[in-house]
From Swiss-Prot:
Belongs to the ABC transporter superfamily. ABCC family. Conjugate transporter (TC 3.A.1.208) subfamily. This is ABC transporter C family member 1. The chain crosses the membrane at residues 119-139, 147-167, 214-234, 244-264, 332-352, 363-383, 773-793, 819-839, 884-904, 906-926, 999-1021. Residues 111-394, 763-1061 form the ABC transmembrane type-1 domain. The gene is abcC1. Residues 1073-1102 form a coiled coil. It comes from Dictyostelium discoideum. Residues 470-690, 1116-1350 form the ABC transporter domain. Residues 420-433 have a biased composition (Acidic residues). The keyword Coiled coil applies. CDD domains: ABC_6TM_ABCC_D1, ABC_6TM_ABCC_D2, ABCC_MRP_domain1, ABCC_MRP_domain2.
């Protein structure tokens, strides 16, 4: 029955509200144009075009994206970007606040209608006090002079005066909101475009965390200012002048007393505003640092867990958070003082005005309540003008942060010349006559930036010429400067294979970076083709399907795609994936092995069909068999007719090169293999010495033949020719999935959809919030104090009514003034108390929520990070925490302040006119229905808007990580288009969220105006003129609060979504057992060292005790271990059994994806065993605390993890070792000379990711950590894959010496690094297929290892 009634109401409402508009529950509105575009004038004025969404959201359940229409074209980012087309942010622009000034100019030029509405609103603000003045005159007139029809006319006049003012306000806010969205859109996309242009040097000051703060916080503050506050200083000033003139007309010059007080308080408010802005700026700076560290923490979470360094990073983040909170607290204190000033000034102005007026005049009803009405109207500009000044002062540092980012160094423009430009160039000579890639007299420097490339404006030519002259002068002065690459000449013949080789840190990556424009070109000339494919040493992958990562924005060519899959040897890997090539790849390829990631990058380059391929170590992470296949079928196969530049340490391929470039300490020697040998350059000696003496090449003629690992040209070529296609037994069609298969697509998903709660925010969320904010009783007391303060304030008006009528005989004005002052003082006292109580609650909640969130995420399982993109997680720490920090205090204060004001006002009106409760009940019913209609839709729109932010941040994170790849493929426009779509989606939800609010505001304001009419109407029948006027005045004052209460209640619920989203992360799955030793202080550790045994501080261990002398041997045993990633899918290790004796050095080999790295993940419990167990020294590691386990093991990971901080901090984060011990470790890994040559040595700062260090140097730095740690069990996961053979040979000696008393597991594709191992374990498809000594395995001609060795240049024979 109720359901039928609901449907009937729905049908009636749909018909009445939508009129002739078509309403279809099943229609997809996502692609439909904005209904405002085709709405008639009435619908535009009343926002009736937004009704469909309101009805759909209320009757059809939660709104979905299919219910949301498209944006108007002028609001889309593609249009709004024009706002910043002509801005000049050049470094030589000395204008102050260029961004703010530019937006003001654009606003004045583009928003004349908004300016007109602001003027109209100011004029209409005078109408209500005037109407009240004439109504009071009518009420005070004798019964003979009063006409009932005239009274009705005055009531209608009050209704019109009230509604016209608020109605014009709604239209004003709507058009201002459109401008705000345009500004937000153009700034957001400009920040993203700038991100894609950042140089390596420019990027050092910014990382995804700080840029995300710019997008989520700074841009939002700027756009909000230009929505509400941008006209405040001018509009509220003019409104105050108009109302002040009216006040002087009513009470004479006494009105100037109040004005004088306001003028006096302006400097105080300005000073407080400046303090608020200053503290906000400081807090934002620490917020950036905190977000940067959090971003770094999330990106490196796997490494941090393996190193057991979570505590280190959590402490660093908390340190920045504490500093941020320090300034947020100061800001809050100043904010409270500002609010106290505003509220107190309102009251004091009224008191002093009446005191001065009463000296020579008698306070009458007309004077008293017309003055009150004027001051009620003045209350908005009185409150908002200081707030606008304060907001402008706060905006200046925020805008400066955005300006500084937009001015940061960009990638160098005109870095290289293409072939068409070469023909007309003055340097055109035989260097590039055949279309070769070349560098002519080139000098490059990582630390220098392009001064002309920074900024986004169109600076004038004179400024640019001056900059160029200054740059030339600097270059002349720095001729003696040592560049990264100085005055080099390089040539890669067109259509040929050029191989670049050299020792670690010699400048190989810098050389190719010079070709693609990633390093600043100081001088010289670079010639490159138009289309280049570049693969980085650390692969860049998007969080999308494997297929999309290969296509990378190009159209699908099925035949070429199949050939690419075959050439890159991906077919066997794809067969093992759930959805084949449609399998979703996690962020940074977390569900792939290193070799698989490199081959996908190589496939992307190959599919692009470019003119030139630059490949930086694409063969280092694959086994010899796959490396040979890639070289034969990809580099020398499908790429054969293209120019190829290959950086590699794989010596077996060097004789096959058409051109070879040897790089040593920034110097180049180049030629064919035979030419270099004739010059005395022999690759045997290159790999046997740390540094080449290029100037004495002719003297290097003798080589140590016993260590010769290079094949002759003929042998090498034969080896490659004899290699068979290792994927020729696989039907390529089997690995290409049907993208229309919904079941397959579902299985391919790795990332989980973001949680979205439906309906109102659960009461539990509020309870949890207040529990984090001290206590629930404290909040209840705060609510009571708010109510008491507003009752006292309203009683002052009640007393004024008594005063104006002299209701108490024989009392002088002094008596009335004293009581009135008592009310005002009481109000101010309770005002201070309520604000400080609310500040304590919200500040404590903010502090504790972040602490709980950080702890929860820090201890989360790895699966959580695998299935949630980092941008989504970081969104909790940036936008959601920012909302909790900056908005909830204001919102709770507003709701309690406005809500208590409305309740007290209604109580007064019912007390004065009891009969008014009858129409009130009807209006309350209508009011409640409209409010629910609005709340259901607005809340879901806000939730969708919050969810739509995560894809923006995820794309930003991925783009920043892949800047070099995106730029080398010239895919900036594609990524900008992707970001535009995501911003438009986010703004679409904001736009319709604003529209439904304007819809409800117009209707609630009309109801408020009816309340004014009813209060005036019932006052016609009241014999007490004072009470009658008080009722009408109270109704007029309540109008502005009623709609604001509803708006702020919904806004509060929306922002509580941030709390809800944070709390959803407080209960995420944690890793196995708790981490003992984690929160113990040094004294506890010393006490425990004196004991023979210690207990785990966790109930899960059931009294299990771990011997203090655990892990003294290093024996490892895998017993029938089975490990799988996630709850579904194939196991990565299957019935895996392996026993390793103490001090054994075990080499682990197998093709990529065989399960080698899973052994390490299982050992460190990065993933738990689904079956079986792993024992170390006889103890099942599943019973050992994770921190205890991981801190006892050593690891050198495949992808080196370098975090921001000093070199010392990266090597010894807990400050356990002396300088001499650190230097010894660095000397052992051959980094001592490199580090000691740096000006600050161990205190040299390194940026996140180790910018400034080569890939090999990063690996060596990680190795130095493990050497210092001196663990009994060490895992080496491709630890030397990025290191040349000579350094690798020296490091191998170091490893053998340093870890001779350790049990070591070495995962490697370069067999020379494991040939001396005690035993070799061969893994295939998650199973142990061979396990024996290297001698025994090689002597067995049928063994897999023996065949691998043959593919690796017969290394064993040379032993």
């Amino acid at each position: 029955m109720l359901k039928n009634l609901r449907n009937k109401i729905k049908e009636k409402l749909t018909y009445s509200l939508l009129s002739s508009q078509e309403f279809d529950n099943n229609k997809d509105y996502y692609q439909q144009p904005c209904p405002e575009d085709n709405a008639n004038l009435w619908s535009r004025l009343t926002f009736g075009w937004a009704q469909r969404m309101l009805i759909s959201g209320y009757f059809n359940g939660p709104l979905e994206m299919s219910d949301i229409n498209d944006l108007p074209k002028d609001i889309k980012v593609q249009s709004s970007i024009q706002l910043l087309n002509n801005i000049n942010l050049n470094k030589n622009n000395n204008s102050r606040w260029p961004l703010i000034k530019h937006f003001y100019k654009q606003f004045l030029y583009r928003n004349k209608l908004t300016i007109f509405l602001q003027i109209l609103t100011n004029i209409l603000s005078i109408l209500s006090p005037l109407s009240l003045k004439y109504f009071i005159q009518f009420i005070q007139s004798t019964n003979k002079e009063r006409s009932f029809l005239a009274g009705i006319g005055y009531c209608i006049l009050l209704l019109i005066a009230s509604f016209s003012y608020t109605f014009s306000q709604q239209l004003l806010m709507w058009f201002a909101m459109k401008s705000s969205l345009e500004i937000k859109g153009c700034l957001s996309i400009k920040v993203y475009e700038k991100t894609l242009k950042l140089t390596t040097c420019g990027g050092k000051n910014y990382n995804p965390g700080s840029i995300m703060n710019l997008l989520s916080v700074d841009v939002g503050i700027i756009s909000n200012f230009f929505w509400i506050e941008h006209m405040g200083i001018f509009a509220f000033s003019s409104q105050m002048i108009g109302l002040l003139a009216l006040l002087c007309w009513v009470i004479g010059w006494s009105g100037l007393v109040g004005f004088a007080i306001m003028v006096i308080t302006f400097p105080i408010n300005t000073y407080i505003g400046s303090k608020i802005g200053k503290n906000l700026k400081e807090s934002m700076g620490y917020s950036d640092k905190r977000t940067n560290l959090t971003s770094e923490f999330i990106n490196g979470i796997r490494f941090l867990k393996m190193y057991a360094w979570e505590k280190l990073f959590l402490d660093r983040i908390e340190e920045q958070r504490s500093l941020q909170l320090k300034y947020l607290y100061k800001r809050m204190i100043f904010w409270i003082f500002a609010e106290m000033m505003k509220q107190a000034v309102n009251a004091i102005v009224l008191v002093l005005t009446f005191i001065v007026y009463s000296i020579n005049n008698e306070i009458t009803l007309e004077v008293a309540f017309t003055t009150i009405s004027i001051f009620v109207s003045l209350r908005i500009p009185l409150l908002r003008l200081p707030n606008s000044i304060q907001q402008l002062q706060s905006l200046i540092p925020i805008a400066k942060r955005v300006e500084d980012f937009l001015k940061s160094p960009e990638i160098q423009q005109n870095h290289s010349s293409n072939r068409e430009e070469e023909e007309e160039d003055e340097y055109d000579d035989d260097i590039n006559s055949d279309g070769d890639i070349s560098i002519h007299n080139g000098s490059f420097n990582w630390n220098q930036v392009d001064s002309n490339g920074s900024g986004n404006g169109n600076g004038n030519q004179q400024q640019q010429q001056q900059q160029q002259q200054q740059q030339q002068q600097q270059q002349q002065q720095q001729q003696q400067q040592s560049y990264t690459l100085n005055n080099i000449n390089f040539k890669a013949p067109a259509g040929k294979l050029t191989i670049i080789c050299g020792v670690v840190g010699s400048g190989k990556t810098s050389l190719v970076s010079g070709l693609i424009g990633e390093i600043y070109k100081v001088s010289g000339r670079v010639n490159t083709p138009n289309k280049i494919s570049f693969t980085t040493q650390q692969s860049f992958l998007l969080s999308t399907s494997l297929r999309e990562n290969i296509l990378f924005g190009n159209e699908m060519n099925l035949e070429r795609y199949k050939k690419v899959i075959e050439a890159c040897c991906l077919a066997p890997d794809l067969l093992q994936l759930a959805a084949k090539d449609l399998t979703e790849i996690g962020e940074r390829g977390i569900n792939l092995s290193g070799g698989q990631k490199q081959r996908i990058s190589l496939a992307r380059a190959l599919y692009a069909n470019s003119d030139c391929y630059i490949l930086d170590e694409p063969l280092s992470a694959v086994d010899p068999e796959v490396a040979t296949h890639l070289f034969n079928h990809c580099i020398q196969g499908m790429m054969n007719d293209k120019t190829r530049i290959l950086i590699t340490h794989q010596l077996q391929f060097i004789p096959s090169a058409d051109h070879i470039v040897v790089v040593d300490n920034g110097k180049l020697v180049q030629g064919t293999y035979s030419e270099l040998k004739s010059k005395g350059i022999d690759f045997e000696s290159i790999m046997k010495t740390k540094k080449l003496n290029i100037d004495n090449q002719q003297q290097q003629q003798q080589h140590e033949k016993e260590n010769d690992i290079v094949l002759s040209d003929e042998d090498s070529n034969n080896s490659i020719k004899n290699n068979n296609n290792i994927s020729n037994l696989i039907d390529i069609d089997e690995v290409i999935s049907d993208e229309n298969d919904s079941n397959l697509i579902e299985r391919s998903k790795l990332l989980v959809d973001e949680d979205r709660n439906e309906g109102s925010v659960n009461l539990r969320v509020y309870k949890e919030y207040f529990k984090h904010g001290s206590s629930i009783p404290l909040f209840i007391m705060t609510c009571i104090v708010y109510m008491i303060s507003q009752i006292i304030y309203q009683m002052s008006d009640f007393w004024l009514s008594t005063w104006s009528q002299r209701s108490i005989p024989d009392k002088t004005d002094k008596y009335y003034i004293s009581i009135y002052l008592l009310f005002i003082v009481g109000f101010i006292i309770f005002l201070v108390i309520r604000y400080f109580m609310m500040a304590h609650v919200t500040f404590s909640a903010s502090k504790n929520l972040h602490q709980s969130l950080l702890k929860s995420v820090g201890f989360a399982s790895c699966q959580f990070f695998d299935t949630n993109p980092s941008g989504r997680i970081l969104n909790r720490f940036s936008k959601d925490i920012s909302d909790v920090d900056l908005l909830l205090f204001d919102l709770f204060s507003d709701v309690l302040y406005c809500g208590s004001t409305v309740l007290v006002s209604i109580g007064i009106m019912i007390y004065i006119s009891p009969l008014i409760i009858i129409p009130f009940l009807l209006l309350i019913g209508i009011y409640y229905f409209i409010q629910r209609l609005y709340t259901e839709s607005s809340r879901e729109l806000k939730r969708l808007e919050a969810i739509s932010r995560s894809p923006i941040f995820s794309l930003l994170q991925e783009s920043f990580n892949g800047l070099v790849t995106i730029r080398s493929y010239k895919q900036q426009n594609k990524f900008i288009s992707m970001m535009q779509d995501r911003i438009n989606t986010n703004h679409r939800l904001s736009y319709y969220g604003f529209s439904v609010h304007r819809w409800v505001a117009v209707r609630l304001e009309f109801i408020s105006s009816i309340v004014v009419f009813l209060a005036a109407f019932f006052s016609l029948f009241n014999s007490n003129a004072g009470f009658s006027v008080l009722s009408v005045t109270t109704a007029l004052g309540m109008c502005s609060y009623l709609n604001w209460t509803v708006r702020q209640m919904v806004e509060l619920e929306v922002k509580m979504n941030s709390v809800e989203r944070i709390e959803s992360y407080l209960n995420i799955p944690k890793e196995g057992n708790s981490k003992i030793n984690f929160f113990r202080n040094e004294q506890q550790e010393e006490e425990e060292e004196e004991e023979e045994e210690f207990d785990f501080d966790n109930d899960d261990y059931d009294g299990f005790k771990l011997s203090k002398k655990w892990l003294t041997k290093g024996e490892i045993e895998f017993r029938n271990v089975e490990i799988k990633y996630g709850h579904s899918g194939e196991s990565s290790l299957k019935n895996f059994t392996l026993k390793i004796n103490q001090k054994d050095h075990i080499g682990i080999v197998g093709r990529t994806g065989a399960g080698k790295s899973t052994i390490g993940n299982g050992l460190f419990r990065m993933v738990e065993c689904s079956k079986g167990s792993i024992l170390i020294d006889g103890v099942d590691i599943s019973k050992i605390g994770l921190h205890e386990l991981r801190s006892s093991l050593g690891i050198v990971p495949q992808d080196p993890f370098i975090f921001s901080g000093t070199i010392r901090l990266n090597i010894d984060p807990f400050n356990k070792y002396t300088d001499s011990e650190i230097w010894v470790a660095l000397e052992k890994v051959k980094l001592k000379s490199t580090i000691s040559s740096m000006p600050l040595k161990l205190e040299t700062m390194i940026e996140e990711g180790g910018d400034g260090l080569s890939f090999g140097q990063k690996q060596l730095l990680c190795l130095s950590r493990t050497i210092l740690k001196n663990s009994k069990v060490v895992l080496m996961d491709e630890a030397t894959s990025g290191i040349d053979y000579v350094t690798s040979d020296l490091i191998k000696q170091t490893i053998n010496n340093c870890f001779k008393n350790c049990t070591m597991l070495t995962i490697a594709h370069r067999l020379d690094t494991i040939i001396d191992s005690t035993k070799i374990a061969v893994i295939d498809k998650g199973k142990l297929i061979e396990y024996d000594t290297p001698n025994n395995l090689i002597e067995n001609q049928e063994s897999r290892f023996s065949k691998l060795v043959k593919h690796h240049h017969n290394l064993f024979k040379e032993k």
